[in-house]
Amino acid sequence: MGKGNGKSKDSKGSEKSSTKTKFFVAVMGAGSVGKSALTVQFTQGVFIDKYDPTVEDTYTKTFELDGEQVCIEVLDTAGSEVLVAMRELYMKNAEGFILVYSILVKSTFLEIKDIVEQLFRVKEEEEVPIVLVGNKIDLDAHREVSTNEGKQLANSYPNCDFWEASSKDRINVDNVFFSIVKRIKEKYKKEGAPVKEKKEKCIIM
């Protein structure tokens, strides 16, 4: 997939600027699980049906959640087989994490555990906002990972939600990103830390 320089543009190609509550989220997981497809479907409403290994790309979108305008900046990271050394940088900077596996490939699910272990080690926090996503449920007949396995793994971590999704059919795509914002806000609320408003360039929908 051809990608731009990471700047956010509206449907007419012009950059928008607005003061919003902003959250920085990293999407992580093995290669070919659909991280880019999930991210682009949410931010641009387009399904990518061709696999093009990502090095790193950033997308932003503004939307209303619980009566509040929020801006989410999403870092679409490389598959874990590429640029593994950069994982720690993503982990240090992001406020929340969407961890994606393919329900069609068991090894991508098992790899999530390694990512989470490294995540907690790098963040040095008891609770890290996480949303676990079993992607490609439009191909459910070929699944290797059951829904219950996904739920059990999510339940083993604090502050973690679980969704099964389809980037192709846009099933639960919005819920995934809404959930991670809610998890981040809950964490700040527990810590008594204010969520700062920043003037950022975001897609105005």
Curated annotation (Swiss-Prot):
One Pfam family in the UniProt entry: Ras
Catalytic activity: GTP + H2O = GDP + phosphate + H(+)
Membrane protein topology class: Lipid-anchor
GO cellular component terms, semicolon-separated: plasma membrane
Source species, domain of life: Eukaryota
Single GO MF annotation: GDP binding
Amino-acid positions noted as binding GTP in the UniProt annotation, renumbered to this chain: 29-36, 76-80, 135-138
Cysteine methyl ester found at: C202
Family note: Belongs to the small GTPase superfamily. Ras family.
Name this protein carries in UniProt: Ras-related protein rapB
Gene assigned in the entry: rapB
